Amino acid sequence: MTRLIDEITLFLESEGFECSRQMRDGAEVICTRTLDGRHSRIILPLEISAASATQAAEVSDRAYECVEFIRTLEDAPLIITEDRWRAQESMMRARLLAHLELFSQAFARNCEVRRIEKAEARDFLTRNHSYGYAACRYHYGLFLKRQTGHLAASLENKESLAPGTLIAVATFSNARKWSKGDRVIKSYEWTRYASLPDLRVSGGMGKMLKTFINDVRPDDIMSYADLEWSRGDVYSRLGFVLEGQKEPVLFSVDPRTWERTPVKPGTTAGDGGPVIPGSAGNLFFRNFGSNKYRMKLTDYE
């Protein structure tokens, strides 16, 4: 099988990007520039080869050290994990190009938010979110009324999207309730948000969040930013406050399908190898954890 770094390099070169392979803190990375040539970007491919939980933890710790090393000297690298690249290749290619400023654009003011059915949300998120669909209570879709942003001359999106196209989905959990004095606080989790991978929706997250708040009147909303992708700066811009971190999650990865399955705490043997049904021959990957954000809409302690 072709090495991950070779595949990504060949893909970018086929799209017209000049690439060089360099070393950063002991890791081989891809160096390129955004489409307009104004910004350099570093891509850190992470192959998945760990045969045990212990090895996966060591690889994760080393990769995180490399990410932090790069961040102190340059911009944060784009992290591409092997399972994502191979299992969701079309989405990952489009998302990578979008990070390099090759994307189409839409503005939230030219869109409308509507409640959608679970099946429609599931289908969209399965195709366009790295973790797919997760059980939730509220499903919202962002539908294009007209497109006035620029268009990317790459991949499938070479023409304007038709009015009425579903371009983003946001989902929220049911309420978690607790008592504060004589009040009942209702807290919700913003479970998923994804747009079409080669489309940047300016103001999309904010518009969908505002609709949910107006519909449901929550006291509190929390969400997680997966550190594989970002630190969650967009949440801060929306008014959320960083509250803490969620510990890294260990996954069992099927090398035939590249599907991730979380390994539940307490299911590992003494040597660190997960003891779970169907894990024989699987590889293991531990992510970097998540940043936890919260928006308080009601004043409570």
What is the predicted role of each segment?
Residues 55-86:
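Catalytic cores of nucleic-acid endonucleases
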Residues 72-75, 217-221:
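Short, high-confidence coil segments that cap the C-terminus of an alpha-helix
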Residues 27-28, 137-139, 288-293:
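Short hydrophobic/aromatic beta-strand or adjacent loop that forms the aromatic wall/cage
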Residues 1-22:
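Acidic-basic catalytic patches of nuclease active cores, encompassing PD-(D/E)XK
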Residues 91, 95, 100-219, 225-233, ...:
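A conserved beta-strand-loop-helix scaffold within acyl/acetyltransferase catalytic domains
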